Amino acid sequence: MGSVSSLISGHSFHSKHCRASQYKLRKSSHLKKLNRYSDGLLRFGFSQDSGHGKSSSKMGKSEDFFYIKVSQKARGSHHPDYTALSSGDLGGQAGVDFDPSTPPKLMPFSNQLEMGSEKGAVRPTAFKPVLPRSGAILHSSPESASHQLHPAPPDKPKEQELKPGLCSGALSDSGRNSMSSLPTHSTSSSYQLDPLVTPVGPTSRFGGSAHNITQGIVLQDSNMMSLKALSFSDGGSKLGHSNKADKGPSCVRSPISTDECSIQELEQKLLEREGALQKLQRSFEEKELASSLAYEERPRRCRDELEGPEPKGGNKLKQASQKSQRAQQVLHLQVLQLQQEKRQLRQELESLMKEQDLLETKLRSYEREKTSFGPALEETQWEVCQKSGEISLLKQQLKESQTEVNAKASEILGLKAQLKDTRGKLEGLELRTQDLEGALRTKGLELEVCENELQRKKNEAELLREKVNLLEQELQELRAQAALARDMGPPTFPEDVPALQRELERLRAELREERQGHDQMSSGFQHERLVWKEEKEKVIQYQKQLQQSYVAMYQRNQRLEKALQQLARGDSAGEPLEVDLEGADIPYEDIIATEI
């Protein structure tokens, strides 16, 4: 392996190339727009931020700029030409020595470069274009096709020109520049692919460590997953667009069938996978940014090491050459691994394309079935419309009948409420009648007791009369004896006469009291008889009224039951229901009250 002094001589260290890939879109309307870079331009050169103070002046002097002429004209004019720079020979093949006397050669190649419609500055990047998702060469849009590169100068050897197959994004067989270019992102194009391979080669070539190489391999694995998702998203977007294009306007809204449901499920799955694809793309862009920063930082550090003091330069050059040899070997292995992964991805892409074709055939068969079922569906819809009209008419009639039934039911409920009220009143009257009957019984018992008391008083009065008569007879006898005694001689018992008179007065007073009590009792008894007779008349009248109301309520209930039976049978659906709530008048004299 030769020394790396050629990297220091001249400005070849900064002469990084910009290789654009030609992308031709098959159907721009069938593809979805993905995220682009913010500037939409090719990145050119490395960042020249100096990490060490002593090498800053040298870095400023060794900077080199490449200008690319960009001519933006209207469509249909001649294609502007500008020179494309390539660093294909910068690293050489794995195992070939570097030549310190000869600088690396630039490989010119003609290709199409997609340019933004707003900016003309072009900068290279350290990434290589990836495979198109359709498995074939993508075609550029009409706007991007107007910008082309200048053809190679005639003095350059033809062996160094790149073949057109490189425009398809395939990796080189020799392993050189496997990760040195990136497809440009144009703001005017409708679809672009994200870069796939991270910048591992140049980083390892300028003294990269095994840790950095391992990080590059990890980034490559994640980018391979991103390419798989991109390839499946292409088929999904095409299928989704074919579903949208096959839809046609229809005058009658057809119900969703199971086939359309399956189509919608497939479209939903495709949309979910596209969302996962966008997430993978965002993560890939973050990793790409980190790798690009590491890629730009590594050459600067290598240059600072190479531009150090002279005594240490030889050892560092040897170490750098050994590291570059190891890096070239690792890169060769990585290229082989990437080629193997590329073949696997192509196989997966073919399987996905087959699956897409199968889904498209299923979709076409579903569409044919849909068109074949169209006339029968229209006939059934017409019949359904007729039946719906009949159903609406029947519903209207049913509503009218329901309103009538509701009115009758409300009337019946009102009558039931009235019946309940009258029954409550009757129960109250019955309770009142029972109370009056109980009071009447108690009065009768009291009357019997009073009669018995009156009879007893009468008996006592008779006894007192008899006693008074006996006492009067004795008094007369005593008076007669006293008169005889006066006539015959002095009185024998003059002290007994006042006592007998007092006793006589007392007995007379008691007799008067007894007579007064008897008169009062007889007048009370007479008053009680009159009150009892009045109460009896009232009770009899109330019983007659109660029986009359019972009979009227019974007749009304009979009529209501007949009306309910008629409503239940539906005989008088169109005839108005007449209910006589007053009832027939019963003569009051015909009611016979029960005896108390």
Swiss-Prot record:
Say where the lipid (N-myristoyl glycine) is covalently attached: 2
Give the Pfam families listed for this entry.
Fez1
Give a GO biological-process term: regulation of postsynapse assembly
- Which residue windows does the record flag with biased composition (Low complexity)? 178-190
Basic and acidic residues: which segments have biased composition?
Answer: 153-162, 295-310
What keyword terms does UniProt attach to this protein?
Answer: Cell cycle, Cell membrane, Cell projection, Coiled coil, Cytoplasm, Lipoprotein, Membrane, Myristate, Phosphoprotein, Synapse, Tumor suppressor
Domain of life of the source: Eukaryota
Q: Where is this region: Disordered?
A: 136-193, 295-324
| Tissue and organ expression note | Highly expressed in testis, prostate, spleen, thymus, ovary and brain. Detected at lower levels in heart, placenta, small intestine, colon, liver, kidney, skeletal muscle and pancreas. Not detectable in primary tumors from breast and prostate and in many cancer cell lines.
As a miscellaneous remark, the entry gives: Defects in LZTS1 are found in many types of tumors.
> What is this protein identified as?
Leucine zipper putative tumor suppressor 1
This chain's source organism reads: Homo sapiens (Human)
The lineage is: Eukaryota, Metazoa, Chordata, Craniata, Vertebrata
